[in-house]
Amino acid sequence: MGIESIKEHLQPVSEKIKSLRSHDKHDHWLINEIGFKDVDYYTADHVLIGCPQHEGVQRNKGRIGAAEAPDKIRKQLYKLQMPENSEIKIFDAGNIKTDIYNNIAEDDILNEMESSDALNRIHDALTKAVETFLKDGKNVIVLGGGNDISFADVRALSNTVKESSVINVDAHLDMRLADEMTSGTPYRKLVEGNHLKPENFYEFGIRKENNSKKYLEDAENQGTHTFFLPDVLKEGVTTSFKRILDDIQDKPFFFGLDMDVIQAADAPGVSASSPMGLTGREVIDMVYLARQKENMRILEITETNPTYDIDDRTVKLVSQIIYCYLLG
């Protein structure tokens, strides 16, 4: 299909990021090996794309700020050292154009119809982009933004393959009932839209105290596989996660990481922080395990919120997670 078919939806990476360089000639940063030109797309095996908006978070009454995450993450990721003899090829497609939301204040409420239509258009553009990458044989890394983008990314995978699995590593089910899309509704809308079969859906790290009884019952009744945080910690995080990977077998799968699943000590800069959660090390171990399976097609990381970060702790953790995914 080619990168040209979706360029109207893409905002290229800023020159400031592309020009990142070390003061030490002996450093070999990841930025030196990232492709930004259209021609680089065709030789890449991995494509990175950002979706810098937090409209869905705002609708869900969360803390806004996630729109700033994709470029903040890039700045940390691209300063990490490139391992010697690595053959991985990465193309950075830039960000989905989301200008309509970039400068909206928290109390500046758009007309409901305008807001809904705009967010739907953003999701449509992201679905088209990710679907293009998948059909061109690329593995995809998506940086949010709010967790509502899971609707767009899972839909893209569903449109591309006959059957797929979805892992949502999250403190929340994100199965709220609502007419409009929010960061709390993507998986309900995916199931209702026949883009996701409940028996192929795994919720991991869920905290009962952060989810309504109705939605917990809905997940159970429809056949979703739910792994609650206390059970995961008791069994062992990697042991529990391996059971999911074994169950998925060879089906192409989506790995969605909502950063609020991680304890605030490791990830303070998220849309909904909590002192309870997985550790950063545990999540990196999970990503490493998932990466060993060649059928992992999408890594999506959402709800990083630089506004509330401390010394870039959260964006640095995200960069390490991506680095592990790419380079082990």
Predicted regions and their residues:
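Conserved alpha-helical scaffold segments that buttress catalytic/binding sites
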Residues: 2-328
